[in-house]
Amino acid sequence: MNILFSKRLGILTIGSLLVLAGCQTSGSSAGESNQTTSSSAVEEDSSKTQEQTSDSHTHEHSHDHSHAHDEETEKIYEGYFKNSQVKDRLLSDWEGDWQSVYPYLQDGTLDEVFSYKSEHEGGKTAEEYKEYYKKGYQTDVDRIVIQKDTVTFFKNGKEYSGKYTYDGYEILTYDAGNRGVRYIFKLAKKAEGLPQYIQFSDHSIYPTKASHYHLYWGDDREALLDEVKNWPTYYPSKMDGHDIAHEMMAH
């Protein structure tokens, strides 16, 4: 990058070289990602400052990186990824207070979601979508609280708590050709009312805080992996039904 300090040719000072090096370092840091993104330097008018040049360079890198990252995230969400991209996760990724969406299906709050899907995705009527999701969301566990390694199930007015330890993940291939990852946790000590295994699926494949998730639970680890018709779904308890509906339509 050539910098014109005046109309007459001059000799770059050591200080100018240091400023230049700082500008280049700033740009490369902002553009760091799995996919290398390049951007060209923009010629500046002599009245503009070095700082403005650096900011422009950084913004361009950040924009390109964000766009590439969003595309990759969307592909992963849809179930298209490489095995090498899958990483282990901690239970803390699902930490929080969660509510089942099943009651919102029952009271009609999610009807707008099914109408939206019918109109934009096709294949089923709104009523057919509702019936499909009714089977998927159905559960008697209306709330789940996860704190550190402890999971508490709220079922029929009663609470059941136990500690769970990480038991690896399984990559599943669905009939449609896309894939998903189940993150599995095992009950550390047998306790009344608690499943031996819980399996999370949230469309992510590496450490990240979940915004919602599908949960499978039972005492047979392998049998749970075959369950693809019933997937109780949980969103943060602080969200109301309409917020959840709009979040669903955004995906």
Curated annotation (Swiss-Prot):
Instruction: Provide the binding site for Zn(2+) 2.
Output: H212, E247, H251
What ranges does the record list as Polar residues composition bias?
A: 25-41
Q: Where is this region: Disordered?
A: 25-72
The signal peptide here is 1-30
Q: Where does Zn(2+) 1 bind?
A: H203, H212, H214
Compositionally biased spans, kind Basic and acidic residues: 54-72
PROSITE patterns recorded: PROKAR_LIPOPROTEIN
UniProt keyword annotation of Metal-binding present: yes
Q: Which Pfam family, giving just one, matches this sequence?
A: ZinT
This protein's UniProt keywords: Metal-binding, Signal, Zinc
A molecular function annotated in GO for this UniProt entry is: zinc ion binding
Q: Which family does it belong to?
A: Belongs to the calycin superfamily. ZinT family.
* Protein's UniProt name: Probable metal-binding protein YrpE
Organism of origin is Bacillus subtilis (strain 168)
Print the organism lineage: Bacteria, Bacillati, Bacillota, Bacilli, Bacillales
